[in-house]
Amino acid sequence: MNFQSKFLTRSQSLKSLLCVGLDPDYCKLPEIIKRSPEPLVHFCREIIDATAPYAVAYKPNIAFFEVFGSSGIRQFEKVIGHLKNNYPQIPIVADIKRGDLDNTARQYARYYFGDLQVDSLTLSPYMGLDTLRPFLEYQDHLVFWLCLTSSPDSIQFQKKRFSETGRTLYEEVAYVANSISPLNLGFVVGATNTYELEILRKQNPDRIFLIPGFGAQGAKLDDLLPVCGRYSLINSSRGIHFASDGLDFAARANQEAEKIHNAMQARFVFL
């Protein structure tokens, strides 16, 4: 089953758009987890098992694993393995934000799509289409191109206008994507940019959007749901998995995920 089918099946089944981010910042892990031989695996497994009833997708962030070198990469692979072995119906978005020339990009694509078999990942468009093409060859997988992020300093680049076209940089990214138009290409659009999100959705009704910035970064469901559209994954990371730093961290994560799930069901009109 390709990413789009897996996402739509899961989303319709749960009547939700919730993507649970996995950002296992070691400094914030509960003390009992820090004493584990593989703390990142231990923590992520607990969070996954606690939130799986409500997750449309999971988004593990590679940076929190890479900081531990080869041990961290092994732990990342074990987390991916746990998801694929126990929850094969839930799509995985590897948050890697890579962006390099064709030959290098091909190696990334081979590792993440070929070896790990994640369903999707995030890429930076800064170096152009060469960074993208090797990934699009894996037609059952999906690429999320960074379009307009939720970071406060994104305005320094992403909202600058091209004098030739009048388009902003984020609009240019969407324009270029539509010029090649494969549907296994989606956009990352930050939740704090609701005005721009609405415009991008109207221009791209059938593309899947990954929308980070909800929860801990301040965006609210009441603002997002009227404009994000059916083909969206609204991500919450810290707001779920760091709801508690005590022994009840998994139970609290379950409660937070359930709360978001219920709010989405109540406020979103599903076709």
Curated annotation (Swiss-Prot):
Enzyme Commission designation: 4.1.1.23
The keyword Cell membrane appears for this protein: no
Broad class of enzyme this protein falls into: lyase
Keywords tagged on the record: Decarboxylase, Lyase, Pyrimidine biosynthesis
Active-site residues from the entry: 97 (proton donor)
Gene Ontology MF terms in the entry: orotidine-5'-phosphate decarboxylase activity
Cited Pfam families: OMPdecase
Keyword ATP-binding recorded: no
Pathway entry: Pyrimidine metabolism; UMP biosynthesis via de novo pathway; UMP from orotate: step 2/2
GO BP, sorted A to Z: 'de novo' pyrimidine nucleobase biosynthetic process; 'de novo' UMP biosynthetic process
Classification via Gene3D superfamilies: Aldolase class I
Family matches, as SUPFAM superfamilies: Ribulose-phoshate binding barrel (SSF51366)
Source organism, top-level taxon: Bacteria
Catalytic activity, reaction form: orotidine 5'-phosphate + H(+) = UMP + CO2
Family as reported in the entry's similarity comment: Belongs to the OMP decarboxylase family. Type 2 subfamily.
Full protein name: Orotidine 5'-phosphate decarboxylase
Organism: Leptospira borgpetersenii serovar Hardjo-bovis (strain JB197)
